[in-house]
Amino acid sequence: VIDPHADYVFLSMTRDAKNYSNRITVFQTLKSTGRYNLPRKPEIYQVKFSDLSLDEIAYVCGIEERYTNILRSLQNALDELKNKDYSLADLIKTLKSTNDKSKAESALKALNYVEKLEKMNIFGDVTTDMLKILKPMHVSVMDLSGLEDRVADYVTFRILTEIYSLREKNQFEFPVFVFIEEAHNFVPNKENPLSKGIIKRIAAVGRKFGVFLILITQRPNKIDQDVLSQCNSQIIMQITNPEDQKAVRASSERMSEDLLKDLPGLNIGEAIIVGEMTKVPVMVKIRQRETKEGGADIDVVDSLQKATEKAKEEEKEKELELKEIKKMMQTTEGY
């Protein structure tokens, strides 16, 4: 489960915080901001820095293709470190030690980009073994909360690429179901983030290798239409935006105009299911979830009520302090 906002981190717990399943593992990066208590401590996901290619480093750093001199300086530094088990610190040190004056300016600019990676906290001594993440009859949640978009995109790209490769080469023998929350951010209609290519490949041919894709989004209009049309079944909840309705209609041959008109009027928990999972479109009522919810919106009314109570308590404390001060002053005057 690709989880950008820590929505799925409590899958192992019931709504009253009891154990629900031992077959669920949460993975975090050191930069993940999700703060929660789980029966088991989350596993750390990290990437060995020397595993990154030049293109991957440039993408995560935000170095554009047109900055050819900066990219050349970065490539020169990587060439110096070639065949070594180098770290991010080694690359920074190599860029700093550039002695050639003609290359020093570009190396310094490259250094400014590369030093940003130190704050990302996803690079370690080893890359997390995918076979720790992929297990039979098991759910692994990748908590990407708090990561910059490019970093979250890179982690998603790397995980999905490794999953696809393992299944393509039959190095993991069981089918894999990949859930991508906020899918419009990873496979958008217009932009081309790093993970878009591998998601499109999985959508097109993944089922041949036992990799199945489940996209979750509130904005279907923002998802690449080729990928959306590859979804054989759709579970559609309330949609009021006309552009999103058009995207759903265009991606499903079984979505009639009558059904489309029903979408804005669906109540909470109601959905229309179309596609290969059902012979005809059906409307269903989805039961309440059994597991604890993560990443939910705050209860604004409750929070404001608590804020009001807190403010009143502080006012009372100030009044008591003033009374004490007046009492002390009166006592002093009496002397």
Where are the predicted features?
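Repeat-unit-sized solenoid/scaffold elements
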Residues: 64-72, 88-94, 220, 240-258, ...
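Glycine-rich loops and low-complexity Gly/Arg-rich segments
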Residues: 24-27, 54, 71-73, 165-169, ...
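Conserved P-loop NTPase motor module
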Residues: 269-335
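P-loop NTPase motor domains
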Residues: 1, 5-203, 208, 267-275
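Conserved ATP-driven motor cores of ASCE-family P-loop NTPases powering translocation/secretion/packaging/pilus
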Residues: 202-285
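Short secondary-structure boundary/capping segments
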Residues: 14-19, 194, 230-232, 252, ...
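Non-catalytic surface loops within mature trypsin-like serine protease
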Residues: 146, 241, 288-290
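Short coil/turn linker and secondary-structure boundary residues
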Residues: 47-52, 86, 102-105, 240-243, ...
